Structures are given as structure tokens and as C-alpha cells.
């Protein structure tokens, strides 16, 4: 059977098929990211020379700019292809927004605390206060919170935002979770000290965060989970985060356990203990009645023309 070009591009409802919309979205986001970062570098160099040399601003800016490009790309796609308002992307100000952020912060910190407690009780790690100016700790905390918030918002916009929602519409929830989670893992393929367990755990993290979105129809919960996981892991407890070390973490970590359990130089995300923590979190999110969407989020999702 030979398909017409119109059937390849459009579905039976006359809407551009999900695969094409995702491709357009990624092209828009890529072009926007390139333009925003180039403009930032040019402006910083010519107008704000001190900012151009700021290591800390240089770490936050790319995440924020790529995140902005991802949201702008979503706005264009939603407006001209999906006929949906931008607030259906997942960052709308709704009645459960504060609850979802609080749930993400508490659950993310609890998960890392349990992981750290098990490793400490098993004698695999020990913790001590890091050296340095203790008075700078609050400012350093705020800095890392900003970095990890920008990073989490960027990654969630890209992997649980418009592209994921189009996948849900095109191939269903299960297929969308699988595809996006594998893509999320492959994005970490070249991280320092990565291993097979780390890639598996990153797939599980993608499933975990996808469920957080699907249960709430909002990006507040997955973003706060993602941010708090990284902040707790790297800054508070002093572990490597996906192979990256926080040089001014508040805790000094000494590691002695086997790499296949602790993750070694990659951090806990490269060990089987993290696998168990993530599986438990997936089960909890899937079954918890406390994780639910706001009424406004439900109405937005189920309005005409939506997935």
C-alpha cells in the first residue's frame, strides 16, 4: 500500500503527526539555543566584561538559555500546530503548584538520605564537614540550588515537556515513557566514569520523572524532584553527580565500598543500591494517591485538540 505524502505528514484528524512535530520542535529549540547563547556571549563580552569572566554565571547561563529556548520552541509548536495554550506545557500557576514543589523537595531529599544512610550503615562511606569558610555556606547553597534548578528545568522541558507530550499523543504513554527514558539515558552516555549500571539507572530515573509528570500533568513535581536529587547528592552529601564532583560541597565524603554497589567515581547513580532506590520510588509514585493533578491541569489536558 502506497501512502500519500499527506498521509505521511498528517494523521486522520488532519493534525501534523507527532514525529514531525517533535522534529520541528527540536530544530526550533536547537536554533533558539544557539542564538540565545551566542547573544549572551556577545553581550557579556562587550557590555559586561566582568560577567563574561564569571565562572558561576557561566555555569548557570547555558542551562537557563537552553531552557528558555525549549519553552519558546514549545510555545511556537503549541500555538501554531497543537492549538493549545503554553500553560499546558506544565509550568502553569495552579492550585497544587506549591504542594507539588514541596513533594518533590521532600521526596528527593528523602531518597538521597535513605541511600546515604544505607551506605554509611554498611561501612561503605563516611562523612565529615568539608574544610573552608563556613560563613560562605549559605551563599554556596543558593548558588548550587540555582544551578541545579536551571539544569533540572532545562532537562525536564526537553524530556518531559513538549516532545514527551507529543510522543504520548503519537504512541501512547508506555511507548513515550520508554522512548524518552532511553533518550534521557543516552544524553549521559559521555559523562565521566559512566558505566552500564549508570545508564540503566538513568533510564529508571527517566521512568520515575515521567510518572511524576503523568500523575500530575505538571512539570513542577519532576523538576523539583530532579533538582533536589542533584542538590542533595552533590552539595549536601558530597557525592559525585553523574560523574561530576562539587568542589565546594558542604560535606567531605570518603568512599570504601565496592563500585558495583556505590557507583564508584560516577557516584551512587552508577551502583545497584541506587537501582533499588529508584525502583521503590517508581512504585511509590505509581501507587500514591497523594500524587495527583490539580483540577485545572486536568481540564487543560482534556480540552479539545490535546493529547
Where are each of the predicted segments found?
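N-terminal, membrane-interfacial amphipathic/helix-forming hydrophobic leader that caps
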Residues: 1-86, 90, 234-307
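Hydrophobic alpha-helical transmembrane segments
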Residues: 22-27, 60-61, 101-106, 141-142, ...
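Membrane-embedded alpha-helical segments of multi-pass membrane proteins
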Residues: 64-69, 138-145, 158, 200-204, ...
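Membrane-interface helix caps and helix-loop-helix hairpins in membrane proteins
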Residues: 130, 187-196
Amino acid at each position: 500500500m502506497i501512502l500519500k505524502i499527506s498521509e505521511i505528514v498528517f494523521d486522520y484528524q488532519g493534525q501534523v503527526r507527532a514525529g514531525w512535530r517533535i522534529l520541528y520542535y527540536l530544530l526550533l529549540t536547537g536554533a533558539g539555543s544557539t542564538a540565545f547563547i551566542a547573544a549572551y556571549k556577545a553581550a557579556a563580552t562587550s557590555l559586561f566584561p566582568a560577567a563574561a569572566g564569571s565562572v558561576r554565571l557561566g555555569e548557570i547561563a547555558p542551562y537557563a538559555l537552553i531552557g528558555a529556548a525549549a519553552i519558546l520552541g514549545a510555545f511556537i509548536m503549541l500555538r501554531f500546530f497543537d492549538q493549545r495554550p503554553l500553560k499546558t506545557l506544565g509550568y502553569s500557576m495552579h492550585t497544587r503548584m506549591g504542594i507539588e514543589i514541596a513533594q518533590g523537595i521532600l521526596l528527593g531529599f528523602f531518597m538521597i538520605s535513605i541511600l546515604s544512610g544505607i551506605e554509611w550503615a554498611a561501612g561503605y562511606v563516611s562523612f565529615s564537614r568539608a574544610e573552608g569558610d563556613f560563613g560562605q555556606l549559605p551563599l554556596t547553597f543558593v548558588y548550587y540550588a540555582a544551578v541545579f534548578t536551571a539544569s533540572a528545568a532545562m532537562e525536564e522541558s526537553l524530556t518531559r515537556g513538549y516532545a514527551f507530550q507529543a510522543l504520548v499523543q503519537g504512541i501512547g504513554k508506555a511507548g513515550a515513557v520508554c522512548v524518552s527514558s532511553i533518550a534521557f539515558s543516552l544524553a549521559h552516555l559521555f559523562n565521566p566514569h559512566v558505566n552500564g549500571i549508570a545508564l540503566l539507572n538513568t533510564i529508571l530515573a527517566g521512568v520515575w520523572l515521567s510518572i511524576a509528570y503523568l500523575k500530575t500533568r505538571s512539570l513542577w513535581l519532576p523538576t523539583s524532584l530532579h533538582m533536589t536529587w542533584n542538590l542533595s547528592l552533590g552539595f549536601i552529601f558530597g557525592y559525585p553527580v553523574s560523574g561530576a564532583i562539587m568542589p565546594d560541597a558542604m560535606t567531605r565524603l570518603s568512599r570504601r565500598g565496592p563500585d558495583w554497589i556505590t557507583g564508584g567515581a560516577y557516584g551512587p547513580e552508577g551502583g545497584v543500591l541506587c537501582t533499588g532506590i529508584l525502583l521503590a520510588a517508581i512504585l511509590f509514585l505509581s501507587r500514591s494517591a497523594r500524587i495527583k493533578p490539580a483540577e485545572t491541569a486536568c481540564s487543560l489536558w482534556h480540552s479539545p485538540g490535546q493529547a
